[in-house]
């Protein structure tokens, strides 16, 4: 099973300018290498059969004939292979010369795509030799003894995907041919290029491809010539780049003196989901009305067992590397701006937050502090309420008080023990029975206290629940589930930890920083069950519902990508192979789907709160799901996993 992945390659072969036999042999070698690695489609650079830098030699009949002989050699010697190859070469026909891409498979030429936009400025002189596709009316060409379709509107259909082709400068045009190809169904776009180097040009190139890939919601394979091309005036670095929907997933080593084959997998299943979700894509297809494409069928590619080369981030919600600081600041600013608008609009006099000494309430408090500072309001109008109960430990209690005091907010302490004891008497519940009644009564008592204090102080209760908890329904209905504005509702648990740590290290004095770092290291717990005999947390959330890093991984690929359970399991096993065994992953995947469906009723009445990332489960925004939807199909697929 390939799970919707199509294995593609960008090849940068060694080249000798105007030596077609040598170039054909190098191309053959890389096709054979790619076939052995399960590649389904491989692209080569622009004019790779002759070399791009032949100059006025393109006017020589010998070069053109040898180029076709080189193509015949490649076609013949790869006729037993399943792989589809896209080669660049000059093609002479009816008194003109075309800079073209030729698609071959199993001993046949499938089609020819000529270049549309010929650069004729600065170091480029292509119009000196070549004719643009727009000036050619023919729709077929004789090549290698075959008459094959020709045009810029060819779409090549395989059993797994549809792809289209453009050549180098085509991408730089205001409306590239690939835009039309994508609107007509191309899911993967190939660009055969001869892109020379210049200071800063590579970053611009990556930005350009990223934008086109994202705009077309497509895979984009860019392949440019490298070592061996003439360096009379310019240098070619051998750029092989593979993008998917705006993200770079594979790249070549620039300035290599050897041939390279860069391989990765395009997730066409995900691209199809994105195109369905982003309705402007189909709307553009209707409004722009591109002409009807010519569809070319390919032979069935023998699907080998998928050997996925792509790596997947175990923490897809968490920014990495140089992006970390910028993204954390951006996320924090979204939360702050959302809360500020709500406070100003309601003319609230205070913000009331329940502080447990855990991660979520800590982040909510930090958002409140930053919001009040930015509005120029006194921190004393932030009322932090610690409400110790039967399961509160010294560690979390101390951290809650230390944090509130170091931040200079108003601190209130209201124990819930006596109120809960009385409540248990009122409803005739045995206090020694630590069941759901015992736990939820405490959560609802805390919410009642916060709501009443907010009424006392003309304030708003700020919700602390995060995206991961809400996805799993790990919240007491009308308890911690409820607030007047929830700032964390779109922030997953794995990201909460990074945000708190980021604030600690970038925006806090030493006392606050040390407290925050200890909170980050504290086991996640609702602390509704009494501590153990040593005073340590007994009720650890991740022992009960599973590791949050797994659930956040499941959540991302379920909601963001629309993947089915078997595909999520496949990716999770690969990604966490050194952390969890398959049975553990399957167990928690089953828990995830069971709880996600069963707990939708809590998400159907969530308080308002700002969307932060690409995923939100607000019933008014991103996620509108009936509370009584059946989970049977999803759970059945999980159960069937080997």
Regions found by a protein language model. Name each.
Residues 1-352, 370-379, 411:
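Enzyme catalytic cores with a strong preference for nitrogen-chemistry domains
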Residues 7, 18, 159, 216-218, ...:
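ATP/NTP-dependent adenylation/nucleotidyl-transfer catalytic domains that generate, transfer
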